[in-house]
C-alpha cells in the first residue's frame, strides 16, 4: 500500500501533487456529468416508478444514499443540462464542476448560457 492510499504523505513534489489533484478533479467532474445524464434518462423513462417510490429523487435517496434535498437538486440539474449544450460540454470534458453547474443552471437559459458559462469558467 502506498502513502496516498494509507492516508500518509505521498512524497511527490508539490507540482506533481498539484497536477494529480487538478487532473483527478477533471475526471470527477466528467464522471459526475455522466452520472447526471444517466439520472436524467432514468427519470425520463420512469425507472424509479413502482407502487411505492414517489420520484426519482426518492429513488436516489433510497438506492444511492443521497439526502432527499441533494437528490432533488441532482434531478433538477440533470434535466437542466439537456437544455444547455455548452454548459453540458464543459462539464462533460471535466472543465466545469457540479457545484458551478448547479449554480448556473438555476438561472441559465439558452439565451444566457454563453455568458454564464464564461462567468463560471473564470
Where are these regions (language model features)?
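Conserved C-terminal region and hinge/linker of Rieske [2Fe-2S] proteins, especially
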Residues: 1-122
Amino acid at each position: 500500500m502506498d502513502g496516498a492510499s494509507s492516508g500518509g504523505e505521498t512524497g511527490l513534489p508539490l507540482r506533481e501533487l498539484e497536477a494529480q489533484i487538478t487532473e483527478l478533479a477533471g475526471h470527477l467532474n466528467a464522471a459526475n456529468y455522466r452520472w447526471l445524464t444517466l439520472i436524467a434518462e432514468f427519470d425520463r423513462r420512469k425507472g424509479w416508478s413502482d407502487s411505492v417510490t414517489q420520484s426519482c429523487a426518492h429513488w436516489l435517496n433510497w438506492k444511492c444514499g443521497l439526502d432527499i434535498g441533494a437528490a432533488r437538486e441532482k434531478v433538477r440539474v440533470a434535466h437542466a443540462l439537456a437544455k444547455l449544450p455548452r454548459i453540458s460540454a464543459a462539464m462533460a470534458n471535466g472543465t466545469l464542476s457540479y457545484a458551478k453547474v448547479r449554480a448556473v443552471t438555476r438561472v441559465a437559459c439558452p439565451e444566457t448560457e454563453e455568458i454564464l458559462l464564461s462567468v463560471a469558467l473564470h
